[in-house]
Amino acid sequence: MPFVKIDLFEGRSEEQKIELAREVTEVVSRVAKAPKEAIHVFINDMPEGTYYPHGEMKKKN
């Protein structure tokens, strides 16, 4: 049962997240030979100020 976690800065619309989840499901199903019903996509909206690569705050562009 594939689980896919996607972390994004918040700000995408519900429609964009639905499209992303559907497209990711299609690719994982095709490549991993997994039934779509078994694939779970988690999209985490990260608020600005919660991501610190290399110890520095990352701001969305």
UniProtKB/Swiss-Prot annotation:
Its EC number is 5.3.2.-. InterPro entries: 4-OT-like_dom (IPR004370), Tautomerase/MIF_sf (IPR014347). It holds the Pfam family Tautomerase. The active site is at 2 (proton acceptor). Keywords: Isomerase. Belongs to the 4-oxalocrotonate tautomerase family. This is Probable tautomerase stu1128. The lineage of its organism: Bacteria, Bacillati, Bacillota, Bacilli, Lactobacillales.
